[in-house]
Amino acid sequence: MDITASFLQDLVENKKAVPKIFSKTTLSNETSAKLFPYQKNHVLNLISILLKYFLVLDTSDTGVGKTYMAAAACRELGRKPIIVCPKTLIPNWASVLEFYGVKYYDIVNYETLKNEKTYKDSNFRVRKRCPYIKKVDNDGDYLKPAFEWKVPRNAIIIFDESHRCKDPSTENGKLLMSSKQLIQQNIPVMLLSATICESYSDMKIPFYLMNFIPHTRNFNEFVRTLKTKYPEYRVRNRQLDQAERKIAVENAQTLIIFKEIKEYTSRIRIRDLGNQFPDNQWCAQQFLSDDSDKIAEAYEEIAELMRELEEKKTQCKNHLAKIQKLKQEIELRKIPIFIEQTQLYLEQGKSVIIFVNYINTMNILSAQLNIKCRICGDQTQDQRQESIALFQANIEKIIICQIRAGGVGISLHDLHGGHPRVTLLNFPDSASDLLQALGRAPRSGAKSPVLQRIILVANVEYEKNIMRSINKKLANISAINDGDLEGHKYQVNEGRRRQRRVLNEPVNNPIEEPVNDPVKDPVEDLTDNQPNIVEV
């Protein structure tokens, strides 16, 4: 074959491989018919941003259908996705892509991909070497990526739950950072997360991918230039005390981020959808407890252990384990409230979703309430899907979930009508985990309203302090996503309790060691596990 013929053949193959789409103002009839009305403009926004920057952040609220809209964008762009997501979400991605008729190159979880592996077939059990990525020895050169990508030209890479990749020092963070080489090759990268950022420093990797900074190490220097760029957000009030000034500075920083990244983001807010989305009432609710004094004492002990950790005292090597045991004890002492409130809502014809942190709490509640549907870290995918199916079909009226196992990527909304959902939740350490858990019941397509309650114990000041701390982080998320400091705040209400029933005393059960807690998945590089318990 001569040079001219070879050149022409390359042109033909490249034309087939890379879709030539320069703008998009309407969706195809096939795609449009499968989207809710409020999703259509968002899909067009995703496509427009990808065509301009080859990078987009979808920060839409949990439950509006980010998976479906990402798949729709792939279809409209004519690209075959490589999906990187938590393992529990793999079957959902496969079914959604099939729904849109989108063929994919790969669907793989973070841990498998970081080890240069993927799955052999659609059963997602047996692994093989991944042809699209390999680890790179950068010889101590921090400017070199930790992974090298080699993907087809018509691919699109989607990082689902991308808030798991916000720390540049973790393997997850390095994996996401390495995707910049794809963006530079005009291969689109999509990040999906309703909680991409809880604090200013969480934006290091997004800023790097957006080419604002040459490396995440340049983040602080870039931040100083933003203060000059946005003088309207300088904190000038000299009468603020130290705590007030800290809050004001953080608020200003998050609003600056909102301004800086808005060209790269698209977002659907539930509160803008009106009656297109199920009514969702939520608050943190206080309940009286006979064990409030013991719970307060446990928090005092946690606060003291935290202070000793901050002071780096030599004898505190077991403090983190002690803190976990105390947190579990506090959750166990809330069991009577969970039982009473669950029975109350069942009598009202509601279906109840319970979120807790520890497997021991889950086991006791399951026995007391005869719960058959469970979502936890030590079950198979088939067991997990069976529990979801029984609850979604309204065969079972209660489902109980560990927050880290059941707070992401599952839908528990009322599909058929007449079975309104109630969520009862013990708050987790992370504001992101809280938002994710509270997004399981209010989903697009739900047929009934949702009531959600974060369980607090009255007369325990530490619980209210924790809620204030969580609200601050939620305000950061809201400000970065929407430029609104009030978007995700939970009101603290007083709750009423019935006459106490005679229940087995939960705190006599053995305390779990934190190393056996399946809520924690060390391979997924989850962050923000140890907040300051006394922060206000």
From Swiss-Prot:
Chain spans, region Disordered: 502-536
Placement of sequence motif DEAH box: 160-163
Coiled-coil positions: 288-334
EC number: 3.6.4.13
Sorted UniProt keywords: ATP-binding, Coiled coil, Helicase, Hydrolase, Nucleotide-binding
Group of enzyme by EC: hydrolase
Family indicated by similarity: Belongs to the DEAD box helicase family. DEAH subfamily.
A matching Pfam family: ResIII
Catalytic reaction(s) noted: ATP + H2O = ADP + phosphate + H(+)
Annotated protein name in UniProt: Putative ATP-dependent RNA helicase L364
Helicase ATP-binding domain: residues covered: 47-214
Amino acids binding ATP: 60-67
Domain Helicase C-terminal: 338-486
GO function term, MF aspect, one: ATP hydrolysis activity
